């Protein structure tokens, strides 16, 4: 019991030090909450607005310890555990938090700046992935982009850092303004899937998990987006890739993909 209590206290002290470092770095005044959950939220909020720069190893060690503890708390989902629920191998369908998946790569639906979501505690997939991976991910994206914008339909790859996934594939899908995608936007969405699979093949990856690119705030209709996703992935000439996971969050997306697969 004493060891458990000591471990909990060490973890809370670690979060407090991480918050203090980022608050000082960002010149933000904040009161550190007493609740462990609220401390985690404050740390995430500070991470979400962090301007990319070099970070000291001491901070990274503290951050990594906390994020890996959070990953363990959520539970890691392996490919093997998904295969028992396979709709049709090698294409798997899973509903849940993509940051739990232990695939070679997960796909992030990014924006054109490709530096993550800057809105504190926002629940978009971009924010969730960056928050779980750690600040190294934003720095890696910053170093790759060099102030450029990522073209719609293009993608690039980074390490996954504190995620169970080894890599993250960042792609930008089309934004649909009137719920009726044009032929160009449909091709751009297909390009997102092709480009991610090309990068996966180039890097010798064997498994990849796709989120529902461009649905949600980008307003691509869910049914048509899923049709494009499934047809594009199935038609892609795979060599190294053995397992493709379609990851969904909403019940309606699960029903759509289940019917298509």
Map each language-model feature to its residues.
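Macrodomain-like recognition of ADP-ribose-binding/processing modules
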Residues: 1-261
